[in-house]
Amino acid sequence: VCDGSYKDHFGTAGFVLQDGNNAQDRITGANVTPGHTDDMNPYRSELGGILAVVIVTEALVAFHDIQAGVIELGCDCESGITAIFEHTYDLPKQPHHDLIHEIRQRMATSTLTWTFRHVRGHQDKHTSYHLLDMWGKLNVEMDSLAKVYWNETHATVAPFYIPSTFGWSLWTTTRKLSSWD
């Protein structure tokens, strides 16, 4: 499960990899969303969280030599889930193409089968936390973690760009373009 946080042209995400309902078997982390400040928005922050889940999962797969398995990604960003899992196109003019393409390519080359689950966000505003299912609780936790990490990093982390591991990227001076027409 991952959730993004965005404010003042800066984005972060909280993420957790957990083995079913077992909260003891989990990896939790937070990341700053890559990209130029002009490209930042809530959607990109959510994509940054999805990318973090994919990268950390890839590291675990490589370290443990995992040859097959299924991972279910939970996220409250329906448009991000749609762009990654349901669209059949992958065009550079698509907003945030750099992250979407990277995520899709990494998933396509993974030894794992990736599935998704839309998790309704901010469920704790209408339902007591202890009454939420596992997915709802994890989303609330990751929302909180993303906000805490935003507060810790927004004043000190400069914009940065992830290297494109599939294909090529387009730059103008020192800025990597997230999409182009």
Predicted feature residues:
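Low-complexity, flexible helical/coil segments
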Residues: 34-37, 107-112, 151-157
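Charged boundary/loop elements
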Residues: 144, 148-181
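RNase H catalytic domain
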Residues: 9, 48-140, 162-165
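Glycine-rich loops and low-complexity Gly/Arg-rich segments
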Residues: 23-27, 97-100, 140-145
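RNase H-like nuclease fold core
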Residues: 1-48, 52-64, 85, 149
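Compositionally biased, low-complexity linear motifs
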Residues: 17, 135-141, 154-160
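Anionic group-transfer/hydrolysis microenvironments
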Residues: 3-5, 77-78, 145
